[in-house]
Amino acid sequence: MRHGMSGRKLNRTSSHRKAMFANMAASLLKHEQIKTTLPKAKDLRPIAEKLITLGKGGTLHDRRQAHAILRDDAVVAKLFAVLGPRYKDRQGGYSRILKAGFRYGDAAPMAVIELVDRDPAAKGLDSGPTAEANDDDSEE
C-alpha cells in the first residue's frame, strides 16, 4: 500500500528527479512562467512555493538553503531581492497551474505554471543566444 506517499517518480532516478526539479524551479523563478507537462507542474509547485517562502525570510540561513536547491547565484539573488518582497503580504499560493492542451507527438497533457502577480517582462529574459547577439559578434 502506498498510503501517505507524496510525489511521482516520473520514470526517473532520484538524482535525475532532484536535478530536474532544481532546474525547473530555477527556470520558473527566473522567467516567472514555464510550460511543462501537467504531472511535472503539479510536483514543481510545492518546491517553488517553499523557495518563495524562504525568499520572504531573507536570513543568511534561508539564502543558503535556497542556494542548496537552486545552485544559481543570479536566481537566488532575484528570489531574495525581487520575489520575496513582492509576496511579503501573501500567505502562500504564489503560483498557479493552467492547463495548456496536449502535446503533439505523444498527447501528454501540458500545463503552464506561472507566478501570481508575475512580471510579463521576465518571460524569456536571458534565455540563450539571440539574433542580436550574433549580429554584434560579426561586427567585430
Swiss-Prot record:
InterPro entries in the cross-refs: Ribosomal_bL17 (IPR000456), Ribosomal_bL17_CS (IPR047859), Ribosomal_bL17_sf (IPR036373)
Keywords, in A-Z order: Ribonucleoprotein, Ribosomal protein
Pfam families: Ribosomal_L17
Gene Ontology biological process: translation
Region (Disordered): 121-140
Any one GO molecular-function label of the UniProt entry: structural constituent of ribosome
Regions that span the bilayer: none
GO CC annotations on file: cytosolic large ribosomal subunit
The organism's place on the tree of life at top rank: Bacteria
NCBIfam families in UniProt: L17
Subunit structure: Part of the 50S ribosomal subunit. Contacts protein L32.
Matches recorded under PANTHER family: LARGE RIBOSOMAL SUBUNIT PROTEIN BL17M, RIBOSOMAL PROTEIN L17
Family of this protein: Belongs to the bacterial ribosomal protein bL17 family.
Protein name per UniProt: Large ribosomal subunit protein bL17
Source organism: Rhodospirillum rubrum (strain ATCC 11170 / ATH 1.1.1 / DSM 467 / LMG 4362 / NCIMB 8255 / S1)
